[in-house]
């Protein structure tokens, strides 16, 4: 058993190593819950024995130093992190410390504000005469990285304050984050391009903000909530609640899930509610931030070296669970990437039963030293994706054997290859049935051709029975053949044939995305097809003038090289010709969203918010969303007072009822199509 001095040294080393990996390398090595527990242990050791406190202790600073590659800037006002409370006793102890700091009797009432703690990355935004002048990361709390060019790409951050008489100088603090649905789309695109997946939204956000190319940041669609306001003293609002109102009036998004609290009981009720309800939110939250409402009293309370005395983060309990690893299976993606997946005894996490989690790649398996039969600790990263966070080797049975990935593709028997610096292992056999199935699933997916009724099970039947050997073969199927397959009746077969016919009308951007070219996602496909009106002009540029492609906003060299390689492959040229023989043009047409957008010199739906509900006669939900956004409109997932139009199809449901109650205008598909075509 180490003595206190040895334990303090051990904790400092562990925490400093983890902080360096998180803040400087952007490669977290320790989950938050473990870091928080170890930090709390070190803090208590130093408080009980002050001689153990050293200058390099993580309790004496906020985080890691700025990384190389960006300019280091000094914060005008320190951007400190918050102390944590892990239970009600911790919260009560903080409240007593706060009362002593402002010289109030214990038990005195205090007005407090409770706000959700967004699981993202803190930013400091400086405005000069209402115009965004500088944006910086937290860094070590005193100095951060200047990332203004990246932050300008975040739509939720105004470049100019929406104020008639903006102050000469103001600084706003807030949290950049990636919403859950956006995170899922980013990982889906990365998977489609054969790239490693992000572990959770916060890590994805941190890595995005530190990209040297702002085009990459723009493509990942970060969001932002503002929560702190710093004005010259004479202009500062009287309270935190008023400051939040000021921020809303200035054009910032402020989290609506907040409350004025008269005592700790109010705070605990707020925290208890959101601990359960957080799973319904479109973003990750890991606790509640409690702040003293009166800003004059905040100044009186002041700061410790590390954090403000007038605020604390009340953390939700970390959702982790132990389980036993049963087996590791491999999945083969449409690009041939082999993804190992852990299968374990079911555990309950974040309101759902979980029994599988991706292991990402062979390096991750080696890092975990994973053995079959191991007791593993599982959590939902960002409350979304199950992941294996660690192994408990002390519980390893004597019969446990190391996990070994196969050397040959389990589908076709070809050698598996790991090229260059890639972490991914691939099957490089283009005729591999698993790659074909993945390519077909991608082609018919909602973001691509959106073929209703053609799911994974049916695709497996078609490939396994040799009925489909390429994408083009889908369009040679007939209703009689489909009707003879398992679980396919005459009606289902006829519906699928109609859906395949309808897919020929999808936009040029969707067709390009559906081809599954390495590195091309939905966003980049739209950008490319806005510049090149057909596949022939795109192929010519890809093979002879790649600089025309890299000149497109958001398109880099890797993507241009992927296009060149794809179009140079005779098999892919044959596929295009085969699909053209089945009615595909691979070009803009009069109803294409790209042409609709080009026809309107101004985005004539800009500033309007739409909500889609029910089934439309001809447009899929994703296609209607795409066309509205091309014309400048915004599509929201829920009805509110800010909604301008509800587009309602069959079986519209509760959204239609709510919209009618709020007096929101209702559109059918015909009226929507008319709005899309009408330009000012």
Swiss-Prot record:
Residues annotated as domain BRCT: 600-680
Gene3D superfamilies: 5' to 3' exonuclease, C-terminal subdomain (1.10.150.20), 6.20.10.30, BRCT domain (3.40.50.10190), DNA ligase/mRNA capping enzyme (3.30.470.30), Helix hairpin bin (1.10.287.610), Nucleic acid-binding proteins (2.40.50.140)
Keyword Thylakoid attributed: no
Name recorded for this polypeptide: DNA ligase
EC number in record: 6.5.1.2
A Pfam short name: BRCT
Active site (catalytic residues): 117
An example Gene Ontology biological process: DNA replication
Keywords, sorted A to Z: DNA damage, DNA repair, DNA replication, Ligase, Magnesium, Manganese, Metal-binding, NAD, Zinc
UniProt xrefs under InterPro entries: BRCT_dom, BRCT_dom_sf, DisA/LigA_HHH, DNA_ligase, DNA_ligase_CS, DNAligase_adenylation, DNAligase_N, NA-bd_OB-fold
Keyword Magnesium: yes
Function: DNA ligase that catalyzes the formation of phosphodiester linkages between 5'-phosphoryl and 3'-hydroxyl groups in double-stranded DNA using NAD as a coenzyme and as the energy source for the reaction. It is essential for DNA replication and repair of damaged DNA.
Sequence positions that bind NAD(+): 32-36, 81-82, 115, 138, 175, 291, 315
SUPFAM superfamilies to which the protein is assigned, alphabetical: BRCT domain, DNA ligase/mRNA capping enzyme, catalytic domain, Nucleic acid-binding proteins, RuvA domain 2-like
Superkingdom of origin organism: Bacteria
Co-factor(s): Mg(2+); Mn(2+)
Catalytic activity: NAD(+) + (deoxyribonucleotide)n-3'-hydroxyl + 5'-phospho-(deoxyribonucleotide)m = (deoxyribonucleotide)n+m + AMP + beta-nicotinamide D-nucleotide
GO molecular function, one term: metal ion binding
